[in-house]
Amino acid sequence: MEVIYMKIPFDVNLSGKTAIVTGGSGTLCSAMAYGLAVSGASVALIGRNRDKMSQVISSLTQQAADEQNKSTVIRGYTCNVTDKSSLISTYETIRAELGSCDILINGAGGNQPGAITVAEMLAKEPGTDDYSFWDLDEDKIREVMDLNFMGTLLPIQVFTRDMVAKRSGSIINIASVSSILPLTKVVTYSNAKCAILNLTQWLATHFGQSGIRCNAIAPGFYAAEQNHDLLFNSDGTPTPRARKIIAGTPMGRFGNPEELI
């Protein structure tokens, strides 16, 4: 797996810091992990696919050596972010190997076909929609809400306790442009990401006197592995939805992962 990122456009020293990145083998979060690692942090990637994480870690490590002439500490851990006991067990291992958490990036998330409508808007004629709001699968809705919202809340509960004692720490939640402006089709995903934004605001207040910072970023549109089929046809040409997105984007293109570093 080849990962290509630009050189870090800033100089920050994170030596002695431990960063945990959930969803760390994904397109966007692996770019963020790279930025943390070449800045000196020890990085723990959390994901569900061990083989994919190994490929990402190998690529990031090699690129850091080639482009930055730096030796990095990046390790992978398989964990279910919606299972608190799994998170607790994983954190015990991370803490023993890399130290307690200083930086947490909550990037685990995703969508499910059963939680997406086929049409962007309800047809004028009743009964002509292939898969409308009323057809959404209850189980898939719960899965999307759990992965995105609970998969953000639970890691914060588990990984940030040590920050309180240190009176220092940074939590960065990955929301979405759909947190602010609900997008057509992806009703459940938009609601889950909106919940993350509200959670972030609540935690920023709750942690306000503790030295722990909690912020969120709301990325726009990026061509990533999980949305590839939504944005591109089998021949590589953009889908009508992709063309519509680009037409409504001032820069006239999708974002690049390294722009989030």
Regions found by a protein language model. Give the residues of each.
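Conserved glycine-rich cofactor-binding loop
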Residues: 25-26
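Residue(s) in the substrate-gating loop at a strand-loop-helix junction
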Residues: 176
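Conserved glycine-rich Rossmann-like NAD(P)H-binding loop of the short-chain dehydrogenase/reductase
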Residues: 41-56
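A glycine/serine/threonine-rich, flexible loop-to-helix segment
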Residues: 10, 117-124, 209, 221-249
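Alpha-helical segment proximal to the catalytic Tyr-Lys
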Residues: 161, 205-206
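Active-site helix of classical SDR
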Residues: 156, 192, 200
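Substrate-binding pocket helix/loop in short-chain dehydrogenase/reductase
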Residues: 115-133, 137-142, 245
